[in-house]
Curated annotation (Swiss-Prot):
Gene3D superfamilies recorded: Cystine-knot cytokines
Name of protein: Neurotrophin-3
Gene Ontology CC annotation, any one: dendrite
GO MF annotations in UniProt: growth factor activity; nerve growth factor receptor binding
Encoding gene, per UniProt annotation: NTF3
Length: 159
């Protein structure tokens, strides 16, 4: 499998879907050969595994599994995320962060922060907030409702 278009960052959702469809149709997901579809007398479809002779014939024609990905692994990791890959059952609502470089890079960081609003990167206040200076507060309630002790003094550096 060549990844030239993926390296260039121009992989579209349609091309990724067609690639996955091709892998599934080729039976590569579970490292199995494709199944034949046969019709029974009542018109119902049934799947039949290929025989060893058919498997040898396909191997001689150049069919070889390229990738072996267990479907159970994909079921467990439905939301695997990396800068280049997002496996999900749902179509993405917006483009990946790598391609959101429409703004010029020279803009002022402060104005960008004001325009985008406040970002929370997993950092939330542990204690209840006060709008005035508090000097004698020794305990507080954290966001889970537990009573916590407030440190009066924090020493940093070598002690």
């Amino acid at each position: 499998i060549q990844s030239t278009s993926m390296d260039q960052g121009i992989l579209t959702e349609d091309s990724m879907n067609s690639f996955i469809r091709t892998l599934i149709q080729a039976g590569i997901w579970k490292n199995k050969l494709p199944k034949q579809t046969a019709r029974t007398k009542d018109g119902m479809q049934t799947t039949v595994k290929r025989t060893e002779a058919e498997a040898d014939a396909m191997a001689s024609k150049g069919f070889q599994p390229i990738v072996s990905v267990d479907a159970e692994l994909l079921r467990q990791q439905r939301r695997f995320s990396s800068p280049r890959v997002l496996l999900s059952e749902n179509a993405p609502l917006e483009p990946p962060p790598l391609y959101l470089t429409e703004e010029p890079l020279v803009q002022n960081r402060t104005s960008r922060r004001k325009r985008e609003g406040k970002r929370h990167r997993g950092e939330y206040s542990v204690c209840d907030s006060e709008s005035r200076w508090v000097t004698d507060k020794s305990s507080a309630v954290d966001i889970r409702g537990h009573q916590v002790t407030v440190l009066g003094e924090i020493r940093m550096g070598p002690s």
